[in-house]
Amino acid sequence: MAVTPRPTADLVDEIGPEVRSCDLQMRQFGGRSEFAGPITTVRCFEDNALLKSVLSEPGDGGVLVVDGDGSVHTALVGDVIAELGRSNGWSGLIINGAVRDASTLRTLDIGIKALGTNPRKSSKTGDGVRDAVVEFGGVVFTPGDIAYSDDDGIVVVTAD
């Protein structure tokens, strides 16, 4: 289901004080600064095999929210995995963790927000959980809800 991106500041103004706005100061890494879509989640720690598997599936304009427990010790996404997501129709990635290949990520037509960078590879054992409710930055990310992201931040709204 494709969702049209909307300015997060406008969403905050419309929703009011109960808005679900992520407090983490994430950085933009992808070539698309505005993105939106239904949420799919992955919880993993310094291991990206599961998220690579998810991005291998049709994204249908969705947003993959990855809770890497805030670790920047290893990168969960690099150019190969980001391109996999782009080519399979994902609109964006929100990563509570690190990425690598930052200069190449900027050239890809996919939104990518993450805490920072680290050139170190993650492990590939497949540890992790898919489609669990995850929480970071003061926001609960529930699969199926809608994430909106732009230069101002990330807002999550309940799907209608």
Curated annotation (Swiss-Prot):
Gene3D superfamilies per record: Ribonuclease E inhibitor RraA/RraA-like
E.C. number: 4.1.3.17, 4.1.1.112
InterPro entries the UniProt entry points to: RraA, RraA/RraA-like, RraA/RraA-like_sf
Catalyzed reaction equations: 4-hydroxy-4-methyl-2-oxoglutarate = 2 pyruvate; oxaloacetate + H(+) = pyruvate + CO2
Free-text comment on the cofactor: Divalent metal cation.
GO MF terms held by the record: 4-hydroxy-4-methyl-2-oxoglutarate aldolase activity; metal ion binding; oxaloacetate decarboxylase activity; ribonuclease inhibitor activity
Domain of life: Bacteria
Listed cofactors: a divalent metal cation
Keyword Lyase carried by entry: yes
Biological process annotations from GO: regulation of RNA metabolic process
Top EC group: lyase
Binding-site list for substrate: 78-81, 100
Family: Belongs to the class II aldolase/RraA-like family.
Function according to Swiss-Prot or TrEMBL: Catalyzes the aldol cleavage of 4-hydroxy-4-methyl-2-oxoglutarate (HMG) into 2 molecules of pyruvate. Also contains a secondary oxaloacetate (OAA) decarboxylase activity due to the common pyruvate enolate transition state formed following C-C bond cleavage in the retro-aldol and decarboxylation reactions.
Protein's name in the database: Putative 4-hydroxy-4-methyl-2-oxoglutarate aldolase
